[in-house]
UniProtKB/Swiss-Prot annotation:
This is Coiled-coil domain-containing protein 157. Keywords: Coiled coil. The gene is Ccdc157. Residues 469-482 have a biased composition (Basic and acidic residues). Residues 300-603 form a coiled coil. Residues 469-490, 617-690 are annotated as: Disordered. Residues 639-659 have a biased composition (Low complexity).
Length: 718
């Protein structure tokens, strides 16, 4: 058998066998329903879901590849085993359904993976069970036939009928109902039990009778044929849609299998259900594809609309550019016309110069004849001629320098005018030289003594003529260069105009941004000034709170506690540090004040006032009352706190209902606490009034300070 491996005839035979096996399996599935067992060839897939068409197309005979052909032959053999095993499993399921009198079992999950031997044993056991049932039913069938023939004899001329025909006559399959599955053609044999009771009613016998099948049916159901015809047409449309969209079609593969197995026969119910499932798969695939296409088409439409808008804008820009180009072309035409006019003028001037040079040549020939006669006198004058040549060279160098300076001074736009001016200047020089030549001829004719000067002037004229020729050629070359420079300048001017427009737009935007930034800076400066004022006020308030803690609310009420205890303690530590710093400064001031008071007391300038003169008469009879605001202000001046009236009125102090203020530093008798004035004792401070003395001492020590703010009584708000 090894030499047959890869043979095309063997592979074709196996392919035909696989096609027949698959058709038989589909027929069994249409009667017993699909069985879901793992495939023997592909254990990870269900056997009934294998795509046999794709497998047969893939594993085929390839003439140029013997290895793949042998592999395909082996795979086809394995597929034959797989299909035979699936056929045995489906037949076993069909036999089980016959034994339990149920043709279409309910849907069930995939079964376990079974070997070939186990599947064959199961099939044989089911077949034996069916044989036993049939053997048990045969004697009952014979007994029933005998009882029917005894109890109900046949009429004359009427043929004897079997019990199967009698039961099939009265027991008919149900009529097809629209909307239900088409099972009228899928049932090949439905067992029906008919119970016949004996006259005595003591025994009950049953018998299996088979109903009408597809092969024995005389007329097929019209509704089924019409529905299946429309189903075929819809399937063709769905397959064509999938092919047009380059999508795989599950229904197409299933349709090929149905055509190969059933042809044009009516489809059974299970096949119709499988058909509907495959068709729904294709429809869902088409729906997803259409959804993806709509998602792609949406942004493309938006991009198309944007492109059309941009196209309109570009058309407008092109029209504007065409208008600008036409204007520029008109300007260039006008400029070329002007250049042609100037060129014609230059040509005319050149012709005039040529005619004049011809006249000069004739005159020079005449003069040369005269010069031949006067050669003897010329030789004597050669030294002077050399000097004149040097002067001529200097003159030419000076003229060249003048020309260079003129070229540097003139602008690029006026070089053409400069060239024309040079040509005119050359013509005027020629006129002058003509006059000089005429005068020289007249002088030569009239005065021979001036012959030497004429010869010198003649040499100068020759040199100037040559220089004029060279200058004329240079002027023509300069004119061509100036034309090229003019064109380049025009292009540069256009570019500079474009750059100027862009810079102007940029300048406008920068100015707008500058104005916005100036507005923002002014707003920020205002906010900064306000914040600085608030900061100064808060600093002043903090200093007052630290300096006069007794005049304000308790510290426990002022501290706003947060959820973080450590943060509150840190804030309290910072406040205490600030308070300690301020108190240290106050201690220094008080120490300096005490030193000054001691110095004044030692000098004898401090006077003691009796205690009886301290208080005014209205306050003598009140016990526990505080002294007037003047004494309180003097006492506050003793501490060295030089506050303005506004800052002192801003502090909050406690006031009795009677209008008299009390301080926690006061004694119960209404007198201030003890003060150590220099070396004075406690008895002296009690008997004398030190407040007025301190006030007088303060006035003596600070005469320039305003005393009104110290003695003016102030009312603190309650």
């Amino acid at each position: 058998m090894a030499h047959l491996l890869g043979s095309q005839a063997c592979m074709d035979s196996l392919r035909k066998d696989l096609t027949d096996l698959q058709g038989t399996i589909v027929d069994v599935f249409s009667r017993a329903g699909p069985v879901r067992f793992p495939s023997w060839k592909f254990p990870d897939r269900v056997a009934c879901d294998l795509d046999m068409v794709a497998l047969l197309e893939h594993y085929d005979h390839v003439p140029g590849d013997p290895e793949f052909t042998q592999l395909s032959h082996a795979v086809l053999l394995e597929l034959v085993i797989d299909r035979l095993l699936l056929l045995l499993q489906s037949c076993a399921s069909y036999l089980e359904n016959l034994s339990v009198e149920q043709m279409m079992p309910p849907a069930r999950a995939a079964g376990p993976c079974m070997s070939v031997g186990l599947t064959v044993r199961r099939f044989w056991s089911n077949l034996l069970r069916l044989g036993l049932l049939y053997q048990q039913a045969v004697p009952q069938k014979r007994a029933n036939q005998g009882e029917i023939s005894i109890t109900k004899p046949t009429a004359k001329g009427e043929p004897a009928r079997s019990p199967e025909c009698m039961t099939a006559k009265f027991i008919k399959p149900p009529s097809p109902v629209p909307g239900l599955p088409l099972i009228c053609q899928g049932l090949q044999s439905i067992p029906v039990r008919v119970s016949l009771r004996s006259p005595g009613g003591t025994s009950e016998k049953t018998k299996s009778v088979y109903s009408q099948t597809v092969e024995t049916a005389l007329v097929p159901c019209d509704a089924c044929t019409s529905v299946q015809g429309s189903l075929w047409e819809v399937g063709k449309v769905v397959i064509s849609l999938c092919q047009s969209q380059n999508l795989p079609s599950s229904l197409g593969q299933f349709q090929k299998l149905v055509k190969d197995s059933l042809g044009l026969k009516p489809l059974p119910a299970a096949t119709v259900g499988h058909w509907a499932a495959e068709q729904s798969k294709d429809l869902t695939r088409l729906n997803k594809h259409v959804g993806a296409l709509t998602q792609l088409v949406g942004p493309l439409r938006a991009q198309l609309e944007d492109a059309e808008g941009q196209k309109d804008g570009l058309r407008k820009q092109v029209s504007k550019l065409e208008q600008a180009l036409q204007q520029e072309q008109g300007q260039r035409q006008r400029q070329t016309e002007e250049a042609e006019r100037t060129l014609a003028k230059c040509e005319h001037d050149r012709h005039q110069l040529l005619t004049e040079t011809c006249d000069l040549k004739t005159k020079v020939a005449v003069l040369e004849g005269d010069l031949k006669q006067q050669q003897k006198s010329i030789q004597a004058m050669e030294a002077k001629a050399q000097q004149l040549e040097e002067e001529g060279e200097r003159r030419a160098a000076a003229e060249r320098q003048v020309q260079q300076l003129e070229e540097q001074v003139q602008l690029l736009a006026g070089r053409l005018d400069g060239a024309s001016q040079q040509i005119r200047w050359a013509s005027t020089e020629l006129d002058k030289e003509k006059a000089r030549v005429d005068s020289m001829v007249r002088h030569q004719e009239s005065l021979q003594a001036k012959q030497r000067t004429l010869l010198q002037q003649l040499d100068c004229l020759d040199q100037e003529r040559e220089e004029l020729r060279g200058s004329l050629d240079e002027a023509e070359a300069q004119r061509s260069e100036l034309e090229e420079q003019l064109q380049s300048l025009q292009s540069d001017r256009e570019q500079e105009q474009c750059q100027l427009q862009a810079q102007q737009e940029l300048l406008q935007s920068l100015q707008q941004e500058k104005q916005d930034l100036e507005q923002v800076t002014t707003d920020l400066q205002l906010t900064i000034s306000e914040l600085r004022q608030q900061l100064e006020e808060l600093k002043e308030r903090e200093r007052l709170l630290v300096a006069f803690p007794d005049l304000h609310q308790p510290e426990e009420a002022q501290i706003q506690s947060s959820s973080n205890v450590t943060q509150d303690m840190e804030r309290q530590v910072q406040a205490n540090a600030i308070r300690i710093q301020v108190l240290q400064e106050e201690n220094k001031r008080l120490q300096s004040m005490l030193t000054k008071i001691r110095e004044v007391a030692q000098q004898g300038g401090l006077k003691m006032v009796p205690q009886g003169q301290l208080w005014s008469p209205p306050y003598k009879g009140i016990q526990g009352a505080t002294p007037p605001a003047q004494a309180q202000s003097a006492f506050s001046g003793l501490t060295g706190r030089r506050q303005s009236p506004g800052s002192r009125t801003s502090s909050t102090g406690r006031t009795h209902p009677g209008g008299l203020r009390t301080s926690p530093s006061r004694q119960p008798g209404g007198l201030p606490s003890k003060f150590s004035l220099g070396d004075g004792s406690h008895s002296a401070s009690c008997t004398q009034n030190p407040i007025r003395a301190l006030a007088r001492l303060r006035r003596k020590l600070s005469p320039n300070r305003q005393a009104g703010s110290t003695y003016q009584p102030q009312e603190r708000p309650t």
